[in-house]
């Protein structure tokens, strides 16, 4: 019984807290791992169904969605299908760069994608996105103005924000010598073999740039070469156990690595399964990002795509998503209502420190930069440096 399990968990933490003389980090529902497995199984079933039914699927209304792992409450997919009769083929990509390659090579049949800000700007620049008809997406009015008309889509023709968050360092407090405060930890030989570096070029080089005191949007080849050398030296000296994306969950939850560079919302998911984990936005600053829904220009399912986007942009969908993915909502009603929603669903108050990690205050975001779409010459340099790194 989930409710009894949750109550027992609270009693256990209270006992631990009393014995230790202080509070322990809160956990939420203990069933996230089961839901993660179920989500993967559901994705396999959806894909298999599309293959097996073949021609019959062609006569159905369908929308093909590509997003990130651990990035939707899958019950929303079921609800949308039941309410609309539209079949959702939901797939995932590991990174913005991997998503771009899939689209560019023509090997992907996506309608709706959910890239990050800088990749959206690139897709717009390369004329790969369709303009949206916002009269078909009335829930766009619920998106806070803070997340409209941003640099990646200044006239707001192509996107509806999905979620926002920050990039930082996750660490196991039992496996490090003290609290981590700097990006130095990602390059520190004292943690050789215990560090997980993120497996995409933009974020990995950003860590090195920040550690060196440079902007994550620099186009200076000398600064990028210096950042590359910092990263390469750490790799060659055995600092990194692995370069990872979704594998980070298992490794950090299982205590198989001490330090990882990853996203705040995913840290909160990991915290459910390992209370020894902590998160920090380093003193040098970091990246804060907005992921947004958009539609590829060659879509054959524009009506279905806009219906899906409108459904996901609703307050109810955003509340459910926040409670599942632990990322902040751009929907102003959902962001305001979430602490009360959490308390009702989980029968306990939301820890203010947890909420601050999920939705950082302005003074934290002021230390962070949004990724800009870089010039083509700089993007080519990133590609060359990443190839030289040999990940």
Tell where the protein language model's regions lie, with residue ranges.
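Early extracytoplasmic/lumenal segment of secretory-pathway proteins
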Residues: 56-123, 250
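Extracytoplasmic ligand-binding site segments that recognize negatively charged/polar headgroups
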Residues: 109, 114-256
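A ligand-binding cleft/hinge motif common to bilobed small-molecule-binding domains
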Residues: 119-122, 253, 259-276
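Ligand-binding "clamshell"
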Residues: 124-131, 148, 152-157, 269-281, ...
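A bilobed periplasmic-binding-protein/Venus flytrap-type ligand-binding module shared by bacterial periplasmic
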Residues: 168-175, 209-213, 289-302, 309-312, ...
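Periplasmic-binding protein-like
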Residues: 225-234, 273-297
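Mature extracytoplasmic/periplasmic domains
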Residues: 296-363
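Conserved C-terminal helix/tail region of periplasmic/extracytoplasmic solute-binding proteins
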Residues: 358-391
């Amino acid at each position: 019984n989930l409710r009894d399990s949750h109550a027992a968990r609270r009693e256990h933490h209270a006992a631990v807290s009393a014995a230790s003389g202080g509070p322990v980090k809160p956990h939420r529902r203990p069933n996230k791992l089961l839901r993660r497995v179920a989500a993967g199984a559901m994705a396999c079933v959806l894909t298999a169904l599309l293959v097996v039914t073949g021609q019959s699927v062609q006569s159905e209304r369908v929308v093909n969605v590509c997003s990130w792992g651990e990035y939707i409450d899958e019950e929303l997919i079921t609800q949308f299908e039941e309410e609309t009769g539209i079949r959702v083929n939901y797939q995932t990509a590991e990174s913005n760069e991997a998503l771009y390659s899939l689209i560019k090579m023509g090997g992907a049949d996506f309608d709706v994608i959910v890239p990050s800000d800088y990749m959206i700007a690139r897709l717009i620049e390369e004329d790969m996105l369709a303009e949206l008809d916002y009269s078909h997406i009335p829930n766009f009015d619920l998106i806070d103005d803070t997340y409209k008309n941003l640099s990646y889509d200044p006239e707001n023709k192509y996107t509806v924000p999905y979620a926002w968050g920050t990039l930082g360092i996750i660490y196991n407090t039992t496996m490090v010598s003290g609290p981590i405060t700097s990006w130095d930890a990602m390059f520190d030989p004292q943690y050789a073999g215990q560090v997980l570096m993120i497996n995409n070029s933009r974020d990995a080089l950003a860590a090195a740039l920040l550690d060196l005191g440079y902007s994550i949007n620099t186009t200076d080849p000398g600064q990028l070469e210096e950042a590359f050398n910092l990263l390469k030296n750490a790799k060659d000296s055995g600092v990194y156990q692995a370069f990872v994306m979704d594998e980070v969950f298992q490794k950090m939850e299982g205590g198989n690595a001490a330090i990882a560079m990853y996203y705040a919302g995913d840290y909160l998911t990991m915290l459910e399964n390992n209370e020894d984990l902590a998160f920090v936005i380093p003193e040098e600053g970091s990246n804060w990002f907005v992921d947004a829904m958009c539609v590829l220009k060659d879509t054959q399912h524009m009506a279905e795509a806009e219906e899906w986007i409108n459904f996901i942009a609703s307050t109810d969908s955003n509340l459910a998503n926040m409670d599942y993915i632990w990322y902040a909502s751009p929907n102003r009603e959902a962001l305001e209502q979430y602490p009360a929603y959490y308390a009702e669903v989980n029968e306990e108050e939301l820890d203010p420190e947890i909420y601050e990690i999920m939705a950082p205050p302005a003074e934290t975001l002021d230390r962070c930069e949004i990724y800009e779409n870089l010039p083509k010459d700089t993007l080519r340099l990133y590609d060359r440096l990443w190839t030289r790194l040999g990940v």
